[in-house]
Design a protein with these regions (language model features):
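PLP-dependent aminotransferase class I/II
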Residues: 1-100
Length: 100
């Protein structure tokens, strides 16, 4: 489900993270590059699952999480902060859809 604002609130989101289910890391990275070429500041921020980070791996004996590992290669984030206009959000959405 897409996030939404109520009439009495203003959102404070700054990123909208998307998962390209079934995509490879290379496909995700190409989409990010294509979005950047169109002026959209897409980024892959969550490259390392928390269970693989040394603190958690060493102190909590984190077990393997294969779906989490796969998701880390498929997710990327889009800029959706309060300064982004409705028109810009529509452009971002339409551009993503045209590229996938």
């Amino acid at each position: 489900d897409l996030p939404y604002e109520t009439k009495t609130c203003r959102h404070s989101w700054y990123l909208y993270t998307v998962r390209l289910i079934g995509a490879t890391e290379a496909q995700r990275n190409k989409l990010i590059d294509d979005l950047k070429a169109k002026g959209i500041g897409a980024e892959a921020y969550y490259l390392h699952p928390i269970n693989t980070m040394p603190y958690y791996r060493d102190n909590f004996r984190a077990k393997a999480l294969p779906e989490t590992k796969k998701a880390a290669t498929q997710v990327f984030s889009l800029p959706i902060h309060p300064s982004v206009t409705k028109e810009e959000i529509e452009f971002i959405g339409e551009t993503v859809l045209s590229l996938i």
